[in-house]
Amino acid sequence: MDRPWGLRPATPTDADWLADLKARAMRPDLERLGLWDRDWARRRFLDTYVSTNTDIIEIDGKPVGVIAVRAEVDAQWIEHFYLDPAVQGRGIGSQILRHVMDAHRDTRPFRLAIDRGSAARRLYERVGFVHLYDDGNGVDQIFGAPGEPPTQP
C-alpha cells in the first residue's frame, strides 16, 4: 500500500525537535485547560523521552511527527503521538496509529491518555478506542483498545 509517510527509529538527537513539536501540537489543548507553559511542556517531554521505543514520522524525508509504544506487563501504552499541526486532518494519524498497533500487537491491550476535551479524541475513537475512566486529576482520560470494557484504575 502506498502511503505518504514513513517511520524511522528515533535517536537521542531528536529530543529537542520533538519537545518543540509537542509544544506546538499540544498548545491548543493546554491553553484551553489553562495549563499552557511552553517551557514546562518541553521539560515534561524531555524528562520522559526514551528514543528506544519511539519512531519519527516522516513525509518526503522530513520529520513531521512522533509516536511511541511503552510496553507494560498488562498493557501497551501509546505515548507521545504528535503530528505537526500543518499535516493534521489528512487521515495520516489514523493510518499511523493502525500501522503501529498492528506492528506491536500481542495479547496485551493498547491504552493511551488524553487531555479532557482534546480534539484528538475523535481520532482515537475512529480507530476504535473507547473511554475507560478518568484518572482523577481532572485532566487525563484513559482510553482502551476496541472491545475493552470500561474499568476503573
Feature annotation, model-predicted:
Residues 26-46:
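Conserved GNAT-fold acetyl-CoA-binding loop/helix
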Residues 62-71, 77-82:
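Conserved beta-strand in the GNAT
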Residues 88, 111-122, 136-144:
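Conserved beta-strand-loop-alpha-helix junction that forms the acyl-donor binding cleft
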Residues 10, 81-83, 114:
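Hydrophobic adenine-recognition pocket in adenosine-nucleotide-binding enzymes
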Residues 46-56, 65:
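A short helix-loop-beta-strand connector motif used in the catalytic cores of GNAT acetyltransferases and
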